[in-house]
């Protein structure tokens, strides 16, 4: 078995072109050394590698599931309360907007805002859509699918966000 050994100077040749955490969903949670200078760490210490597991944990969760019977969106919004969230259905899209004003945390003052837009499948029953926020900050937007050939009814409407007292059963991958 041959193992190719790559010289450390070439390890991050495309470093500036790799995406960083700066534009991830939870960019407001703080920056790490590798976020600001991702290629510098490998230049100074060629054997230093950031933890891939840490990067996965830092990126948050946004998952869409569409099976035969229902359509579900899981979105990690742990920094927002139901009052900070707006969920609207506009024709074939669901728009989720979260915004909270400046508040104090461990590192000073911070304000956060995000806007997500997802396309709804054409066979989702828009009159039966629901949205809930679990105790651990997982927003679950769901709607049943209807048999093909039946009109799903497209209109603009707001979906209220209800609060659940139990943690989410969404995957934590």
From Swiss-Prot:
The keyword Metal-binding applies. Residues 144-173 are annotated as: Disordered. Zn(2+) 3 binds at residue 154. One of its GO terms (biological process) is response to UV-A. The modification N-acetylmethionine is found at residue 1. It is found in: Cytoplasm; Nucleus. GO terms for molecular function: identical protein binding; metal ion binding; structural constituent of eye lens; unfolded protein binding. Acetylation at Lys-70 may increase chaperone activity. The modification Deamidated asparagine is found at residues 101, 123. Heteromer composed of three CRYAA and one CRYAB subunits. Inter-subunit bridging via zinc ions enhances stability, which is crucial as there is no protein turn over in the lens. Can also form homodimers and homotetramers (dimers of dimers) which serve as the building blocks of homooligomers. Within homooligomers, the zinc-binding motif is created from residues of 3 different molecules. His-100 and Glu-102 from one molecule are ligands of the zinc ion, and His-107 and His-154 residues from additional molecules complete the site with tetrahedral coordination geometry. This is Alpha-crystallin A chain. It comes from Camelus dromedarius (Dromedary). The gene is CRYAA.
């Amino acid at each position: 078995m041959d193992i190719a050994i790559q010289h450390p100077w070439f390890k991050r040749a495309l470093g500036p072109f790799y995406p960083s955490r700066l534009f991830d969903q939870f960019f407001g949670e703080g920056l790490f050394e590798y976020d600001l200078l991702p290629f510098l760490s490998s230049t100074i210490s060629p054997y230093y590698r950031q933890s891939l597991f840490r990067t996965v944990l830092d990126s948050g969760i946004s998952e869409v599931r569409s099976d035969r019977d229902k359509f579900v969106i899981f979105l990690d919004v742990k920094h927002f309360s139901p009052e900070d969230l707006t969920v609207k259905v506009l024709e074939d899209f669901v728009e989720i907007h979260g915004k909270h004003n400046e508040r104090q945390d461990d590192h000073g003052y911070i304000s956060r805002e995000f806007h997500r837009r997802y396309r709804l499948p054409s066979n989702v029953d828009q009159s039966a859509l629901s949205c809930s926020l679990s105790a651990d900050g997982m927003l679950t937007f769901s709607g049943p699918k209807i048999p093909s050939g039946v009109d799903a009814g497209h209109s603009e409407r707001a979906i209220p966000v209800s609060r659940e007292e139990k943690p989410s059963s969404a995957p934590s991958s």
